Amino acid sequence: MENAELEVLEITRQMLEAMYTGDPEVHRKHSAADMSSYEWYIAPQRIDGLEFHLKLIEGGGNGTAGRLDILTPRVQLYGDTAIVNYTLLKTSFGAESQPPQFATMNETRVFVKIEGIWQMVHLHKSPTK
């Protein structure tokens, strides 16, 4: 992978972790204010604006995850535009006697380099089943 591909993939990883740690700063830095998203488990319509995601993160984000893995990532670069798609594997651990719980979803993120900083302008999530 090229340096720009690795950079966008690392930003993606940081954004995912921030959703589970309740840290909105990564999203403030790497999301355009007018970003859009489709998140099937939240709403059947498009969600517009970064503010929704910041409030979600500040309110506890996506709960807790014992582990997040980005499976089969692909980064496509077109000048100052990057498209990242992958399958997210979320592993949650319960009590010691309980087996781990797994959840997967497919995600696509579109980034544009604005004033030297990669910013997400669109996010699309879909179920894997």
Which stretches of residues belong to each language-model region?
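Generic short beta-strand segments
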Residues: 86-93
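Short beta-strand edge/turn micro-motifs at domain boundaries
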Residues: 83, 104-129
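A solvent-exposed, acidic/Ser-Thr-rich amphipathic alpha-helical stretch
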Residues: 3-6, 24-78, 87, 101-102
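Residue-level signal for short segments within beta-strands and strand-turn junctions
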Residues: 39, 92, 112-113
